Amino acid sequence: MTNGNGTPPEGAPPQLNVLAQYTKDLSFENPNAPASLAPQQQQPAINIQINVGANNVGENEYEVTLSIEGKAESGSSVLFSFELAYAGVFRVLNVPQENLHPLIMIECPRLLFPFAREIIASAVRDGGFPPLMLDPVDFIGLYRQNLERAQQQGQPS
């Protein structure tokens, strides 16, 4: 809603709309099958890395990409590995400039995560393993870590 000149009325509530969600990239590898599908004597070591990126794609519209990579290993053998880039396009209105970056880098990936988690669980299950249910992610903590890392490297956030 605007006041006729394209600007929101004073005091308009903040809005965050999901315009689209999609898989940008998905890869699952089971490099040692069928041997990797045999019962394991111990729980595999699972390493997960999560990153968030964002691009402005239009007026008040941002593409946010949640990138999740993982690998399960037993001893020196890789059981499986995966990569997922899951994205959404979000429209953000009436948000103060100082709150825009945290909103995009915390709230948007938080909304995407349950869908990405399901895609990964299904891919791992379809690869012959029990579904991998990722633990919830602290996107506030991830955001703070990335800010600290950028400041240490002298980069803008």
UniProtKB/Swiss-Prot annotation:
One of its GO terms (molecular function) is unfolded protein binding. Its main location: cytoplasm. Keywords: Chaperone, Cytoplasm, Protein transport, Translocation, Transport. It is found in: Cytoplasm. It comes from the Bacteria. One of its GO terms (biological process) is protein transport. GO terms for cellular component: cytoplasm. Homotetramer, a dimer of dimers. One homotetramer interacts with 1 SecA dimer. One of the proteins required for the normal export of preproteins out of the cell cytoplasm. It is a molecular chaperone that binds to a subset of precursor proteins, maintaining them in a translocation-competent state. It also specifically binds to its receptor SecA. HAMAP family: SecB. Belongs to the SecB family. This is Protein-export protein SecB. It comes from Rhodopseudomonas palustris (strain TIE-1).
